[in-house]
């Protein structure tokens, strides 16, 4: 392991975050910490992951797209941000691309993603 990869691994271990295994096409729920004045709360942002950049390293990020009141809204989250409270995979999608930018031009049924039928979360598989 080279020096940079070793430093990244140390930083990831120091953060102690549990990032689930997800990829483009998966529907995920991101619990994001929002500060309003003096109060802080967790706001859930649920949508389809349309891209992941820079892998699972410390500089990695992912883009989540959702339709809010008829408008498409995309948000880019750094993977190891301190503002991210939790990431949960709601459902697995079956796609054949790594970047799903073509969903931006689609509306309605054509923007749907097929669900992986035989997906079982790791907690259920062990039980």
UniProtKB/Swiss-Prot annotation:
Sample GO molecular function, one term: structural constituent of ribosome
Keywords: Ribonucleoprotein, Ribosomal protein
GO cellular component term, pick one: cytosolic large ribosomal subunit
Stated role: This protein is located at the 30S-50S ribosomal subunit interface and may play a role in the structure and function of the aminoacyl-tRNA binding site.
Protein name per UniProt: Large ribosomal subunit protein bL19
Keyword Ribosomal protein: yes
SUPFAM superfamilies: Translation proteins SH3-like domain (SSF50104)
Keyword Ion transport: no
Species classification: Bacteria, Pseudomonadati, Pseudomonadota, Alphaproteobacteria, Rhodobacterales
Pfam (any one): Ribosomal_L19
Gene: rplS
Organism: Ruegeria pomeroyi (strain ATCC 700808 / DSM 15171 / DSS-3)
GO aspect biological process, one term: translation
Gene3D superfamilies with a match to the protein in the record: 2.30.30.790
Family of this protein: Belongs to the bacterial ribosomal protein bL19 family.
């Amino acid at each position: 392991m080279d020096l940079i990869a070793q430093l990244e691994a140390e930083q990831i271990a120091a953060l102690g975050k549990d990032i689930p295994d997800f990829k483009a096409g998966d529907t995920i729920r991101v619990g994001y910490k929002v500060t309003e004045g003096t109060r802080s709360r967790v706001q859930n942002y649920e949508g389809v992951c349309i891209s992941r950049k820079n892998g699972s390293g410390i500089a990695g990020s992912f883009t989540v797209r959702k339709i809010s009141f008829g408008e498409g809204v995309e948000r880019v989250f750094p993977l190891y941000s301190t503002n991210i409270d939790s990431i949960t995979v709601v459902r697995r999608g079956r796609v054949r691309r790594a970047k799903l930018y073509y969903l931006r031009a689609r509306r309605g049924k054509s923007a749907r993603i097929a669900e992986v039928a035989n997906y079982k979360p790791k907690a259920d598989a062990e039980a």
